[in-house]
Amino acid sequence: SLKELQTTYFDYYLWHNIGGDRAEEGLDAMGLFEERFVNNGMMDFLNKKKEEGVIRNLGFSYHGDVAVFDHALRLHDEGKVKFDFVLIELNYLDWKHAKEINDYNTNAEYLYGEVAKRGLMAFVMEPLLGGRLSNLPDKLVAQLKRRDPDHSVASWAFRYAGTPKNVLCVLSGMTYMEHLKDNLCTYSPLRPLTNEEARFLDEHISKQIVDYKTIPCNDCKYCMPCPYGIDIPGILVHYNKCLSADHVVKSKADPAYNDARRA
């Protein structure tokens, strides 16, 4: 890696994807962690490289089983490895509602709290939750625009992710130039959320998002091409738009049912 990057050291080097499993091989998340980082001597090797200055800051990225996240931090507490940062998923929906989205998830409030109380820095992924927080239902967009008409819906999520004291870096996947310009506007310089703005997102916007029974599709198109020629993301995105605009008939008791059925 050093040769490919034409350098003699890494500023930030991480253990990637702890918490995942290889169930098809009979390895649960903890077993895979031990196999990849402990039993093969990798942890000792990286500790040595950190002592030599080849690695300036060592961390890990967390995805999956929270027991492995806790275990990795215990290794840090016990002095078996010295971490400087952790890459976690953090956004205003996952802060308190991650488990409501997926029971396998862990609330970002807990993840960040465990990182911060040890004085470690947090790198943030999924600040927009795969684009979901930049494509909100029309009613929620209107509420955000009433409070701040001059900034994008996405900027609320990016400001939320960048506000906590121990957040060092927020990762952003950008597709278009306007995304880059919006991010630069948001972070140059960052205008931290006030406590009142954070509560507005945590207690008002987030709860409404959870109550919308949309299909969790981010139009990533990973499911395409469909062998049957169906535009899967196109259908799901259209359904979600109809749902967010209250254009989905809920039952035969709905006065608009007959009209919708004819359509």
Where are these regions (language model features)?
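Glycine/proline-rich, positively charged
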Residues: 1-124, 128, 136-140, 148-149, ...
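Structured C-terminal cap/extension of enzyme domains
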Residues: 79-82, 110-263
